[in-house]
Amino acid sequence: MAKHLLCSADHIEATDASAAMIAQAKRGNFPSKLYFSVQDMFHLPYADQSFDVVIVCNALHIVPHPEKALIEFRRVLKNDGTLIAPTFTHAENSPWGNLQALALKIAGFPLHSRWTSAAYLAFLQQNGWTVCKSVVLQNSIPLTYAECKKVERR
């Protein structure tokens, strides 16, 4: 995804928990404004309010305690920043989607959260985010795209 955002940003930090995924992403030639690194989404090495946009793509459903990741994204995101959080909403799978989900589990991507689209958006809201835009992309495994802003904490 980071490669497709190059014209939209001055600096991009593309991270993944998997060294193999980062190695694959690094293939090719890219401008110096794109940095790749292996990171833990629960403990990011960036200063508070470092980013205008944080994108977590297809990951919240496969990690235990995704609410803890949202706390870390809140920390590194500027107050007026945007969280973009598309994720698969497996509770609405077709039979083919259930088979694909099983294959993902066998490949090492277990589902820790099986949300419907509505439940996923409610999860984001319950964890301090205002959902400004959402779209469900229907497929054998539906994907719910969400753009969020921080809810001001009192």
What are these regions (language model features)?
Residues 67-79:
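A short glycine-rich, Lys/Arg-flanked "PGG" loop and its adjoining helix->strand segment in the class I
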Residues 42-54:
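A short acidic, Gly/Pro-enriched loop at the edge of an enzyme's catalytic core
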Residues 13, 37, 55-56, 84:
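Conserved Rossmann-like nucleotide-binding pocket used by diverse enzymes
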Residues 84-107:
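Conserved class I S-adenosyl-L-methionine
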Residues 127-129, 133-154:
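Core SAM-dependent methyltransferase catalytic element
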Residues 1-43:
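Class I SAM-dependent methyltransferase SAM/SAH-binding core
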Residues 112-128:
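Short alpha-helix
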Residues 53-66:
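A short SAM/SAH-binding and catalytic strip from SAM-dependent methyltransferases
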